[in-house]
Each structure stands twice: as structure tokens, then as C-alpha cells.
Amino acid sequence: MGFFADLFKVVYSTWRQYIYTTGALLTLTWKWFTEGNEYFVEHVYPEPECLKNWNHKFVQLKNIRMHYVEEGPADGDVLLMVHGFPEFWYSWRFQLEHFKHTHRCIAIDMRGYNTTDRPSGISDYNLTHLVEDIRQFIEILELKRVTLAAHDWGAIVCWRVAMLHSNLIDRLVICNVPHPFAFFEVYNMSKEQRNKSWYIYLFQSQYIPEIAMRSNKMKMLEAMFRGSKAGIRNSENFTDEDMLAWKHVFSQPGGTTGPLNYYRDLFNAPAIPRKLQIVQPKVLILWGDEDAFLDKKGAELSVQFCRDCRVQMIRGASHWVQQDQPQLVNVYMEQFMNEDSYRPIGEIKTFKSHL
């Protein structure tokens, strides 16, 4: 049965990739017929002022040079923040501003993003390398007392960091991504989650996703953050200048290929040994309950894979929770990092595991 189950998964994945890629190709072809070449003209956007007045640094890892922004006292407890797709360090701007008075705040650009190096091969974006980047970053900078905060793809990576290198971090803050084993449970039992995951299959394809993202003045990127379905609900927290910052980063040559390669190598991720599936550091999961991409059931199911885990549902917030409701996110993070003062706020549910 194992062979046939694996064969079915391969066929199913290939079929969905074909369907979504064909749909995207037909849409782009239609746009070419109706709007002409102008639709596909690529623009490189200037760097806005909002990206300039920060403390930018680089560190040389074994295989890449990584860019990061650092704010706050050098001797403070470390808050290390890891962004998702399609984001970059600036997605943590509200947390950098809030916590810089008490913590050594660091927000990185993951490999392939912004001014961090962009390896050319798809296999260079395997989860093994992504986890290793975080491990090396922590060890080379000799970071101690680390709270690791992560969103989206950053959370996919940091769940693994917490499982494989639990000695490097004290606490883990996860924004809108379930534990990988919890995601598999939700995906297998929920048709709604499988439908929400359509983009994963589209992004497996070569070239077409890049064309779609960079065409039409990057309207696809705008829709992700400002659209009615998936976008940030509290629009005042994502300004025109913020949108320009995103376009500036992802309009650079090669600016979309590296991030998309995360998806292209996703199914080659090494299996996590069962004995390591339980996360040992304390975990806080923050979850915007209007996530267009991930079912909130995954957050609750994640508790069983953690030794000590709390889940805070944030009502009226999108997938981009730390940008959408930064004040609440900051309060929850602050209370979690100062464990003695932690408590749920209002009517937001709290779960705690008993492992």
C-alpha cells in the first residue's frame, strides 16, 4: 500500500500543477491578446525612504552572505525575526520599532530575498539549507537568550529549527503557519485546505509564476497584501510607501525566482524523525483568523506537537498578522517573552499542551 499511496500522491500533485499552470498560462495569453505587450513590461521600482533609516548589516555564512537589520541594545535578549513569502525583513517593521527599546532586535532577509545572496539552483532552496542558514546565523553572531519569531515560510523553516536545534533558542513565536505534522493532518482531512493551497502547485512551475508576479505593474503582489480576499484588513498598516517597498524588492533582477524556488524544492524536504517531532522550547502561535491560505484548525492541532504551546486567535486579521494587527501581536509577544505576565486578553482563546 505504501508504494501505491506514494504513487497516487505524485500523480495527484503533478495533475494539480498541470491544471493551475495551464490556467495561469491561458490567463496570461488572454492578457496578451487583450492588452498587448504593455501588460508584460517589467518595471524596476526605486527604493523608498521607509527602507533607508535602519541599521543595515551583513554576515557571511558558509555559502551565502545574509542581509539583516538590527535595532536595540547589543546586550539585550535577542528577538530574531524571520519573514515569509513574498516578504522581506521590513514585514517586521512594527516589531522592530516596538521591541528595540528592550531587546536586541534582528530581522533577516532569507536566502534569495532582497540583498541576501541568491543562489541559482532550485536545490539551493531545500529546507535543509534554509534551516542551516538560521543555525549558522545564530552561532556566528553568538546570539544568546534567543526568541525566534517567524511568519509563513519563515515559520516553516523555524518549526524545523526548533525541532532540530532546540538548544539554540529559548522561545518560539509562530505567525499563521501550523506545525508541519499538523498541516499534513489538516491537508489530508480538509478539502477546503487543499483548495486554499492551490498556489503551491502553480509555483512548482518554471517561468510562468515569475511572469505573473512581475507583469501588470506587479498587481499580483498588490492583490496579496491589499486585495479584498487575502489582503491586510487594517489597510492603514500597509501604506502606499510600504507597497512601493515591496515592489522595489521584488522588481530587482532575480527578485522573484529565489523566493519561488522555495516552493519548487518543497517536496524534496527531508523527513523529520518522529522522535524529534515534539518541539521542546516554549511556543506561542499567533493566528489571524481571516487567513485566506491556511485553515485555523492547523493552529489548534499544532498544540499536540509541542511540549508547551499557546495559541492566540486574532480576530479580524489576515494571514499577514504581524502587519495587520501589530499592536495585539506586540502585546502577546511581550507577555510571552516575559513569561510571568503572560495571560490571554479579551475573548481570544488560549490552548496549552500537557506534554
Curated annotation (Swiss-Prot):
EC number: 3.3.2.10
Family: Belongs to the AB hydrolase superfamily. Epoxide hydrolase family.
GO MF, any single term: hydrolase activity
SUPFAM superfamilies attached to this UniProt entry: alpha/beta-Hydrolases (SSF53474)
Reactions it catalyzes: an epoxide + H2O = an ethanediol
Domain of life: Eukaryota
Alphabetically ordered keywords of this record: Hydrolase, Lipid metabolism
One annotated GO biological process: lipid metabolic process
Lineage: Eukaryota, Metazoa, Ecdysozoa, Nematoda, Chromadorea
Pathway linked to the protein: Lipid metabolism
Record-annotated active site: D152 (nucleophile), Y263 (proton donor), H319 (proton acceptor)
Residue ranges occupied by any AB hydrolase-1 domain in the UniProt entry: 78-323
Signal peptide: none
Additional comment: Less active when compared to ceeh-1.
Stored InterPro entries: AB_hydrolase_1, AB_hydrolase_fold, Epox_hydrolase-like
Name of the protein in question: Epoxide hydrolase 2
Function: Catalyzes the hydrolysis of epoxide-containing fatty acids. Active in vitro against trans-1,3-diphenylpropene oxide (t-DPPO), epoxyeicosatrienoic acids (EETs) including 8,9-EET, 11,12-EET and 14,15-EET and the linoleic acid metabolites 12,13-epoxy-9-octadecenoate (12,13-EpOME) and 9,10-epoxy-12-octadecenoate (9,10-EpOME).
Disruption phenotype: RNAi knockdown of both ceeh-1 and ceeh-2 results in the accumulation of 9,10-EpOME and 12,13-EpOME.
Gene of this entry: ceeh-2
